[in-house]
Amino acid sequence: MSRYRGPRLKKIRRLGALPGLTRKTPKSGSNLKKKFNSGKKEQYRIRLQEKQKLRFHYGLTERQLLRYVHIAGKAKRSTGQVLLQLLEMRLDNILFRLGMASTIPGARQLVNHRHILVNGRIVNIPSFRCKPRDIITTKDNQRSKGLVQNYIASSDPGKLPKHLTVDTLEYKGLVNKILDRKWVGLKINELLVVEY
């Protein structure tokens, strides 16, 4: 299955708020949510919805998500927490959380178009796994800095997670440590995803 490129608001109405997918919010008087939420929720449906939330928020394919679940399953700690840590340490997600892009697909495009440097080297793979003490900067040309400048100016510094720091003047971000569960930007029950 390929990455989802269809209407985003349909997914938000169905699954709830997905800040990584889009900044838009559905109208409050929407009847679609009532229609989908009516009746008894089966266990399979609940698990499927949690998995779909995770997939659409982080912009993953089915195969990528299965690979991350497999890696997290090999870890000695809680599989759900390790899964969220792996997803949160992706380069496209860190750019989104630093405020250098408005959405995760926007951050993915910045990385694919070679505007981002990690530790002084160009990285064009959005799934690049960042480690603590990685320094993320933009290229030293006006076009790259201009793309990031608007997003950094409009981002809220109060929403910045504790495991990241950002220097708004130099367009630079730093990964301090691996994140804690409470700073994940998505309301999700990761155990249901692992059980699915």
Curated annotation (Swiss-Prot):
GO molecular function annotations of the record: rRNA binding; structural constituent of ribosome
Keyword presence, Transmembrane helix: no
Coiled coil stretches, renumbered: none
Ranges where the S4 RNA-binding domain occurs: 89-157
GO-annotated biological processes: ribosomal small subunit biogenesis; translation
SMART domains tied to this protein: Ribosomal_S4 (SM01390), S4 (SM00363)
Presence of the UniProt keyword Ribonucleoprotein in the record: yes
Keywords: Chloroplast, Plastid, Ribonucleoprotein, Ribosomal protein, RNA-binding, rRNA-binding
Localization terms from the record: Plastid, Chloroplast
Gene Ontology terms: cellular component: chloroplast; small ribosomal subunit
Free-text function comment from the UniProt entry: One of the primary rRNA binding proteins, it binds directly to 16S rRNA where it nucleates assembly of the body of the 30S subunit. With S5 and S12 plays an important role in translational accuracy.
UniProt-listed HAMAP family: Ribosomal_uS4_B
UniProt record similarity statement: Belongs to the universal ribosomal protein uS4 family.
Protein name in UniProt: Small ribosomal subunit protein uS4c
Organism placement in taxonomy: Eukaryota, Viridiplantae, Streptophyta, Embryophyta, Tracheophyta
